[in-house]
């Protein structure tokens, strides 16, 4: 029997893009990367755990902010190279900028326009030194 992790087409760095989507509304919240370990832990712990390329380590979403993503369903695309996580976003904030979604800008009239409000000041979410904006 084939291991379910072996069915995924990992990129040259051993990563796969993972899109977090609100399980109720369908809104795309964010995109991050997963490796085999983070995906296996996500399934085991039923919460989103990503691979931070900038920090070179596992990133348990919400470990600093408290904005944990509880996983309701995982989906693999037809090419087996993108994962969607249907999540419940605790605290209603997925983005390190303090917004609901990382996709808060719309292309309009030749420019990117911010259309979503900041729900909570990032300085109030993260301790000093966190690289937000």
Curated annotation (Swiss-Prot):
One of its GO terms (cellular component) is cytoplasm. Mg(2+) binds at residues 77, 79, 81. InterPro entries: PRA-CH, PRib_AMP_CycHydrolase_dom, PRib_AMP_CycHydrolase_sf. It holds the Pfam family PRA-CH. It is an enzyme of class 3 (hydrolase). The keyword Zinc applies. Its cofactor is Mg(2+); Zn(2+). Binds 1 Mg(2+) ion per subunit. It is found in: Cytoplasm. Its main location: cytoplasm. Homodimer. Catalyzes the hydrolysis of the adenine ring of phosphoribosyl-AMP. This is Phosphoribosyl-AMP cyclohydrolase. The gene is hisI.
């Amino acid at each position: 029997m084939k291991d379910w992790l072996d069915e995924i087409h990992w990129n040259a760095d051993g990563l796969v893009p993972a899109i977090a989507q609100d399980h109720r509304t369908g809104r795309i919240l964010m995109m991050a990367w997963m490796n085999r370990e983070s995906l296996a832990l996500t399934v085991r712990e039923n919460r989103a755990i990503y691979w931070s390329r900038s920090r070179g380590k596992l990133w348990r979403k919400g470990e600093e902010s408290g904005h944990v993503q509880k996983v309701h369903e995982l989906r693999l695309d037809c090419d087996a190279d993108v994962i969607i996580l249907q999540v419940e976003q605790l605290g209603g904030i997925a983005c390190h900028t303090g917004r609901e979604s990382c996709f808060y800008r719309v292309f309009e009239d030749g420019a990117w326009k911010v259309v979503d409000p900041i729900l909570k000041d990032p300085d109030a979410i993260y301790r000093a030194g966190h690289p937000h904006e």
